[in-house]
Design a protein with these regions (language model features):
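Terminal and domain-boundary accessory regions
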Residues: 1-169
Length: 169
């Protein structure tokens, strides 16, 4: 009997959200969790997110959909926008799970070149399933160069993963 894949997703929530919104649509996180499970055999999906006290309903919903939330206290940037600065947390969690041999392959969801070293390392160890970048135009050239054929974009996923408000008729 063939062993089923056990892949983990590591999601840069801020980058994902901004990237999808820059294309004019909102991601349906419930559909996205199902997509990750079915398409990439993701058994555990971590979302790295800055903690905003007023967003508890969102956090509850994400957990209900099957995500593991990893919070970071936010700070206000120079532009007064909240910043979670989750990069180090995502890399640390991914490396702990790699070191403990907890997953077969990693799905990294970001456009941020700060994750180049992680992606490069996972490629060298044959541990990278795919890098999912929200938007081709905003994806780091470092990620494009490193992930190569293992890089996919959300441009073609809108019909499948777009959040549509339920009509209240």
């Amino acid at each position: 009997m063939e062993k089923s894949e056990n892949n983990f997703a590591f999601i840069d929530s801020h980058n994902l959200n901004l990237g999808v919104k820059s294309m004019g649509w909102n991601l349906d996180f419930k559909k996205f969790r199902v997509y990750l499970k079915e398409k990439y055999k993701v058994s555990k999906a971590y979302i790295f997110i800055g903690f905003v006290p007023g967003n508890q309903r969102l956090y509850d919903a994400l957990q209900e959909y099957g995500y593991m939330l990893v919070f970071k206290p936010i700070i206000l940037g120079d532009d007064k926008e909240p910043k979670g600065n989750i990069d180090a947390d995502l890399v640390l969690r991914a490396m702990i799970d790699f070191h403990e041999n907890n997953f077969d392959k990693a799905v990294i969801i970001t456009s941020d070149g700060d994750f180049y070293s992680l992606v490069d390392y996972f490629c060298s160890k044959d541990k990278l399933k795919v890098v999912m970048s929200p938007y081709f135009k905003t994806c780091s050239s470092l990620l494009k160069k490193t992930a190569k054929e293992k890089l996919v974009f959300f441009n073609n996923l809108q019909r499948k993963l777009e959040y549509k408000r339920k009509s209240t008729a």
